[in-house]
């Protein structure tokens, strides 16, 4: 029932030239445990398994420190903004980048003898996270299953054949994978300078790779390894084939192959890992040729040798979530058949929407536990994926975790917190370097998972002045506490344990409160009374001014509203971005709430200071259409021809529109203006559509949410696995999980809105989607929706709630009559 089913497959051919809109590995099925993952083509004769480790990044010669001149540029930036000088260009700065996520080794399983294949099907079991393939080879049944064990932290593939088969197992050249050695604009990529060797030790085939050596890189002596242990009831022998001349970073003369014959059972156990201490780059070749051992390889071999192969896949966390729509059912149609059917249907097909929902839940769970999802989730089947498959924090990570807490994905929440904790030291340094702040945080647009220093900025994308990031990253942690209450989490991550000196963290005391204090400190320090708006709302600069007068407000200067700039203005470095205003208000309110909760010594005075700061912040402004302005500056014109909607932060992720009807109406109008004025190529980036739908759901605009989802399901964004591209027209050929995971957040928001005092049922559910039922949603007031049923014809709703210890919650439904509220305690 809960599965992704396809009758098609795409064989991944080595050294293949493919069309950017039709990439074979994009059609692979996926599995993961948050740290390790796998892409499997499921091709019957030549299957490919591409292994993943979420921490794999390719070092480069890009600097790993904040530019030293950024501190001195702050006054220049402020003066350029206050004087409306859009020619200041950060001294022609060239943006540098984080390290790029890369795939691990790829195993190729080849059935010998060119058998006749029939009865083919493949599917992913969402309940157990298992990729399954079944077919007949010369009339004999063959089944394959692959899953990633959370308990043992390995990838296990089992092949069972009704009759004995012959199979060869080999590791593909890294160079044979798409885009090896080539970055955007055909710039040579750093992996051209890596070195690798393949080997066989008994029944283990593997590879060890030394990263290229760059001065200042923490991975100058690093590398990665991957090994696959093979168990079979057949015969096994080792052969070799000449190395392909195109495998120029491979130091071997031949490539090993394991040949299996007369086998009815074959099991593969794979583990892959990295290190920053593989030894000197210049010694790697001699060590391999001298049969020297590498501690990393030994670690990997010991891991696969210790595995209990009798372990069965276990049910995943999302098993408690259930969505059923009338007219929606898991019919026998394959994914590609449903997508084709949808193209010929005007309205959204409920059974497709159900499948997309479960697919998103599955993908989120597969990425959960170690970190947050990358741009491509956990998976990559090529080198130099566009945007380096980074963790992008100006919408993409945020969108992908939007349904995390409401879906009750506890492991996803803990992984998100590990993701945040790894970055905080760099965030503190960013705030110190860019603004000269103490004990504050400034979030970059991207992290590669290892570092989060402020390097990715230039005049077109001045992210050094993106001020709202920490507030945005804080919200899911705040929601985690609202959802689950106080909790203690434990990690086995050596780097985290070394960084913080412990392995156990109280979510409130060790994660949320320290980060909130640092985020508040940022807003406390950014205000400079020399830069302000006067009583008439005009932007002013007064050298030496030490305090604000009554009715004056701080300018948030400089400011950046990702990734837009005012109409007719040539610089994105501005002041008073609505996103900044909203984030600042949100953080200050969270901070005062925390103070009133903890009641530490002197908290009353601290609350008074925070409330005073809140009054000194700029207010939102509104344009002639009534829309909230992207910049609260009289001097800037609106620019609605843009995919990003950063100025709608008050609606989502914040909750500020829920009790402010004027602001809510202004945000609704802002969406209308964007829809009207931003059409064409810029409107194909899926994150813009998903972001918009999340905002529309919070604004309780059911028809608008439905229309956005309808556009999505009629686009070309979905692969046959139901995972997604970055663009609705696949024009960039980028595997991206924004839409796949973001859909879960959207549907949850359509079904239930909640805050600490309120549960609203079906706030943005369109009647066009019909009646249905959902179980297991979590709320921000700590209550679980055991079951919610609704009937769009009768306009009645039934809900059963698990109240727990929570009291004084108001349950409302604007468009339906609540027929019954069931209570469980």
Residue ranges and their predicted role:
Residues 1-391, 410-414, 420-430, 635, ...:
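Acidic/polar, glycine-enriched structural segments that form the non-catalytic walls/loops
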Residues 2, 138-141, 148-153, 161-204, ...:
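Beta-rich accessory regions
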Residues 2-10, 327-337, 369-379, 437-455, ...:
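Active-site-adjacent bridging/hinge elements
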Residues 46, 65, 393-396, 405-429, ...:
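Active-site core of glycosidic bond-cleaving carbohydrate-active enzymes
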Residues 86-116, 121, 127, 734-786:
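Catalytic cores of secreted or luminal carbohydrate-active enzymes
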Residues 276-278, 375-390, 439-509, 524-609:
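The feature captures the catalytic groove of carbohydrate-active enzymes
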Residues 353-367, 470-479, 514-523:
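Extended, hydrophobic/aromatic-rich amphipathic alpha-helical segments that build helical scaffolds
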Residues 371-385, 431-434, 528-560, 624-632, ...:
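Glycine- and aromatic-rich loop/turn segments at beta-sheet edges
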């Amino acid at each position: 029932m809960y599965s992704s089913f396809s009758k098609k497959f795409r064989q991944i051919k080595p050294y293949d030239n493919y069309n950017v809109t039709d990439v074979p590995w994009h059609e692979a099925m996926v599995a993961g445990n948050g740290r390790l993952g796998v892409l499997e083509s499921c091709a019957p004769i030549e299957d490919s398994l591409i292994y993943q480790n979420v921490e794999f990044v390719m070092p480069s010669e890009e600097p790993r420190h904040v530019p030293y001149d950024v501190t001195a540029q702050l006054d220049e930036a402020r003066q350029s903004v206050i004087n409306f000088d859009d020619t200041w260009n950060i001294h022609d700065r060239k943006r540098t980048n984080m390290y790029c996520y890369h795939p691990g080794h790829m195993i190729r399983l080849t059935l010998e003898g060119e058998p006749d294949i029939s009865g083919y099907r493949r599917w992913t079991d969402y309940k157990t996270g298992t990729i399954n393939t079944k077919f007949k080879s010369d009339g004999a049944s063959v089944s394959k299953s692959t899953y990633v064990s959370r308990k043992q932290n390995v990838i296990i593939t089992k092949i069972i054949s009704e009759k004995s088969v012959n199979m060869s197992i080999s590791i593909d050249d890294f160079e044979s994978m798409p885009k090896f050695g080539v970055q955007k604009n055909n710039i040579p990529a750093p992996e051209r300078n890596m070195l690798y060797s393949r080997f066989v030790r008994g029944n283990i085939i593997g590879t060890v790779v030394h990263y290229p050596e760059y001065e200042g890189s923490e991975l100058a002596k690093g590398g990665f390894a991957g090994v696959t242990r093979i168990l079979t009831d057949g015969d096994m022998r080792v052969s070799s084939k000449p190395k392909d001349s195109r495998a120029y970073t491979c130091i071997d003369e031949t490539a090993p192959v394991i040949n299996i014959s007369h086998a009815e059972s074959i099991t593969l156990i794979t583990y892959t890992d990295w290190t920053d201490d593989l030894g000197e780059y210049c010694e790697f070749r001699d060590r391999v040729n001298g049969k020297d051992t590498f501690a990393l390889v030994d670690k990997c071999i010991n891991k696969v040798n210790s595995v209990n192969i009798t372990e069965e896949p276990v049910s995943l966390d999302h098993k408690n979530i259930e969505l059923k729509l009338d007219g929606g059912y898991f019919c026998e149609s394959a994914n590609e058949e449903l997508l084709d059917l949808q193209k010929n249907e005007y309205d959204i097909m409920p059974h497709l929407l159900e499948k997309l929902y479960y697919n998103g839940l599955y993908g989120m769970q597969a990425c959960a536990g170690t970190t947050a999802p990358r741009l491509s989730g956990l998976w990559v089947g090529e080198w130099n994926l566009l945007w380096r498959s980074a963790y992008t924090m100006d919408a993409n990570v945020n969108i992908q975790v939007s349904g995390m807490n409401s879906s009750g994905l506890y492991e996803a929440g803990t992984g998100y917190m590990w993701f945040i904790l790894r970055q905080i030291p760099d965030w503190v340094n960013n705030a110190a370097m860019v603004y000269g702040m103490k004990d504050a945080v400034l979030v970059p647009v991207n992290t590669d998972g290892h570092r989060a220093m402020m390097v990715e900025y230039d005049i077109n994308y001045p992210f050094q002045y993106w001020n709202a990031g920490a507030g945005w990253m804080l919200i899911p942690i705040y929601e985690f506490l609202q959802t689950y209450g106080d909790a203690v989490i434990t990690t086995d991550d050596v780097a985290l344990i070394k960084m913080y000196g412990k392995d156990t963290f109280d979510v409130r005391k060790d994660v949320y409160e320290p980060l909130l204090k640092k985020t508040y400190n940022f807003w406390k320090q950014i205000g400079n009374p020399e830069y302000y708006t006067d009583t008439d709302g005009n932007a002013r600069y007064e050298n030496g001014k030490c305090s604000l007068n009554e009715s004056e407000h701080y300018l948030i200067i400089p400011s950046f509203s990702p990734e837009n700039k005012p109409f007719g203005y040539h610089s994105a470095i501005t002041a008073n971005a609505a996103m900044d205003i909203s984030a600042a208000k949100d953080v200050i309110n969270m901070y005062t709430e925390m103070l009133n909760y903890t009641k530490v010594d002197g908290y009353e005075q601290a609350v008074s200071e925070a409330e005073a700061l809140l009054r000194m912040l700029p207010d939102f402004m509104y344009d002639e259409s009534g829309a909230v302005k992207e910049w609260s500056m009289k001097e800037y014109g609106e620019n609605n021809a843009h995919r990003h909607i950063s100025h709608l932060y008050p609606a989502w992720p914040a909750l500020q529109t829920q009790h402010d009807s004027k602001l809510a109406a202004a945000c609704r109008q802002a969406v209308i203006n964007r829809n009207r004025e931003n059409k064409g190529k810029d409107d194909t980036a899926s994150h813009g559509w998903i972001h918009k739908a999340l905002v529309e759901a919070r604004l309780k605009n059911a028809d608008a949410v439905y229309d956005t989802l309808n556009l999505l399901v009629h686009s070309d964004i979905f692969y046959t696995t139901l995972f997604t591209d970055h663009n609705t027209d696949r024009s960039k050929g980028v595997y991206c999980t924004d839409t796949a995971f973001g859909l879960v957040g959207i549907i949850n928001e359509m079904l239930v809105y909640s805050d600490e005092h309120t549960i609203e049922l079906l706030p943005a559910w369109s009647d066009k989607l019909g009646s249905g039922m959902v179980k297991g949603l979590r709320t921000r007031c700590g209550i679980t929706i055991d079951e919610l049923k609704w009937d769009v014809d009768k306009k009645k709703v039934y809900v059963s709630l698990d109240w727990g210890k929570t009291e004084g919650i108001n349950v409302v439904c604007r468009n339906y009559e609540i027929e019954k509220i069931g209570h469980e305690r």
